[in-house]
Amino acid sequence: MSTEGDHVPQAEEVIETVEVVEEETGSSPLSVEDSLKEVLKRALVHDGLARGIREASKALDRRQAHLCVLCESCDQEAYVKLVEALCAESQTPLVKVADPKILGEWAGLCVLDRDGNARKVVGCSCVAVTDYGEDSVALQTLLSSFAA
């Protein structure tokens, strides 16, 4: 019985330490671009990305998408209008990214070398997030930027 009583204060001390660490990481805010990159990586791990205009438009039409990322330099104006209209209809937040290669890298459409650098990146015009995966500081930062 006395050993169980000793474990309870130690567990409380560990919880207090974790809370202090969370407060320290919360003090350095992530930029919207960094948080978007982190959210897309977590969604990719949890199989929650619809990559490409076809998959993304289907997810938006079914109202399964929680977030949509569109490339600004898309050469097909009809694609841009379609995605913007579907996002407006379902009130899905829309983020625009300048370069399709960056979006393709964030969506996992690349090959990583031994050092973890992206090679052979395929450009991507549109990505829809259907499952965020686990909750994170980056997700909260991104969602709060849409609320503002």
Swiss-Prot record:
GO annotation, cellular component aspect: cytosol; cytosolic small ribosomal subunit; nucleus
Keyword Oxidoreductase in annotation: no
Pfam families per UniProt: Ribosomal_L7Ae
Keyword flag Cytoplasm: yes
Ranges in a coiled coil: none
Molecular functions (GO terms): structural constituent of ribosome
Keywords (A to Z) from UniProt: Cytoplasm, Ribonucleoprotein, Ribosomal protein
GO biological process: cytoplasmic translation; maintenance of translational fidelity; ribosomal small subunit biogenesis
Localization of this protein: Cytoplasm
Alphabetical list of InterPro entries matching this protein: Ribosomal_eL30-like_sf (IPR029064), Ribosomal_eL8/eL30/eS12/Gad45 (IPR004038), Ribosomal_eS12 (IPR000530), Ribosomal_eS12_CS (IPR047860)
Family membership noted in the UniProt record: Belongs to the eukaryotic ribosomal protein eS12 family.
Subunit structure: Component of the small ribosomal subunit (SSU). Mature yeast ribosomes consist of a small (40S) and a large (60S) subunit. The 40S small subunit contains 1 molecule of ribosomal RNA (18S rRNA) and at least 33 different proteins. The large 60S subunit contains 3 rRNA molecules (25S, 5.8S and 5S rRNA) and at least 46 different proteins.
Function of the protein: Component of the ribosome, a large ribonucleoprotein complex responsible for the synthesis of proteins in the cell. The small ribosomal subunit (SSU) binds messenger RNAs (mRNAs) and translates the encoded message by selecting cognate aminoacyl-transfer RNA (tRNA) molecules. The large subunit (LSU) contains the ribosomal catalytic site termed the peptidyl transferase center (PTC), which catalyzes the formation of peptide bonds, thereby polymerizing the amino acids delivered by tRNAs into a polypeptide chain.
UniProt miscellaneous comment: There are 2 genes for eS12 in S.pombe.
Protein name as catalogued: Small ribosomal subunit protein eS12B
Organism annotation: Schizosaccharomyces pombe (strain 972 / ATCC 24843)
